[in-house]
């Protein structure tokens, strides 16, 4: 009989956040290894308290459910602590062999771990981040940091196994429980990754896709481009000019004088990919702190899958996938002047291994883990 894996987390299927892309790729690996996978994600358009079994749909061949995203204190408390919806799905499914919890809230995680142990179900975690609430309001910061600390330092070490997105997390948890390293993966057979564009050779076309917030340092790229000697265009996907200036008001003069930086606001995933395909390089820069070391950039894997090399700095274990003249350029320094110098010497095209992050490359290692 085919074993059943229940995969639960804050992913918005089929493609509304990075978590959804990761979970679907991982689920395909499990399916290739003879497992049936059931998904329970979130739906921000769903009314809170909607019966979970009535949300059932089929996504890429996977039985999928959703719970509503909370709004207000009472709903948040329920969301962070209750496991009733998950037990409802478990009780209405074939015998569950394993549960995988994706970046899960700690109280609910603890309850599900107890349930799984009592019912002889393997309980794993898929760990893709080490969140920081730095810069948030005091009460939120205390609650969030406490939740993160308990999950990362205590609960994960007691799981039956961990799927981790970075070498940093693999090294951190080694010796506590078995770990499986899976970076951000894609399905190379999907038509959306086909790239028939010819790279521009009259000017360098860059793209940044994301929401910088406190994570991506888009300001470093803007400052660097303001100093370059080459002709360029930068397409910024994910935020508007007004939103960018709310983060970096001192850049108003730079952007007023530079018409080669174009802000497109938020676009669909497929529209964003089209911009990435057309670019000579996709770009992002991050602080090399624990948050960046623990994660693995979805935009990096997706750009490579599009056939577009990446200009970035060395965070996480990105350097494992970039070699001289292939897949991109890793800038050693976070200094905008050094980034400018690198940009001035960039070739219009570079060899890219489009299949580097295809999920099929990891079928064997997942089989050993399971």
Question: Model regions: which residues?
Answer:
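N-terminal subdomain of nucleotide-sugar transferases
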Residues: 1-52, 60, 161, 223-229
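Conserved donor-binding/catalytic core segment of Leloir-type glycosyltransferases
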Residues: 6-8, 197-216, 221-227, 234-235, ...
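N-terminal strand-loop element at the rim of the active site
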Residues: 14, 35-78, 96, 169-172, ...
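Nucleotide-sugar-dependent
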Residues: 17-18, 216, 268-275, 282-301, ...
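A charged, aromatic-enriched C-terminal amphipathic alpha-helix characteristic of glycosyltransferases
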Residues: 18, 333-340, 344-370
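Membrane-proximal helix-turn-helix segments that form the acceptor-binding/catalytic region
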Residues: 25-28, 84-88, 107-110, 114, ...
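Donor nucleotide-sugar binding/catalytic pocket of nucleotide-sugar-dependent glycosyltransferases
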Residues: 41, 149-194, 200, 209
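Nucleotide-activated donor-binding/catalytic signature segment of Leloir-type glycosyltransferases, i.e.
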Residues: 238, 248-274
